[in-house]
């Protein structure tokens, strides 16, 4: 079973709140999950300590068992001070390198 560490959306319309969960890769975004390992509240100020709350010990455990974080969650994990496995870092670099940079609407209009 492939396992991912990803965000599951909650909250009301226009008021998002996310749980950082460990879930089966084929499960729906907001469906069943194995464990809740943190929260992310984008409505709080970026300097607020409760904007991203992670259980570091449980994340380290799941990374050790082979769970792969999504790009956004990987950024949160690195900011929290947890080291990602080399394999995950390489995959993120490859994705970033292959990502196409599209011009903004304003730039496209001027060209």
From Swiss-Prot:
Keywords: Ribonucleoprotein, Ribosomal protein. One of its GO terms (molecular function) is structural constituent of ribosome. One of its GO terms (biological process) is translation. The keyword Ribonucleoprotein applies. The keyword Ribosomal protein applies. GO terms for cellular component: cytoplasm; small ribosomal subunit. Belongs to the bacterial ribosomal protein bS16 family. HAMAP family: Ribosomal_bS16. NCBIfam families: S16 (TIGR00002). This is Small ribosomal subunit protein bS16. It comes from Rickettsia felis (strain ATCC VR-1525 / URRWXCal2) (Rickettsia azadi).
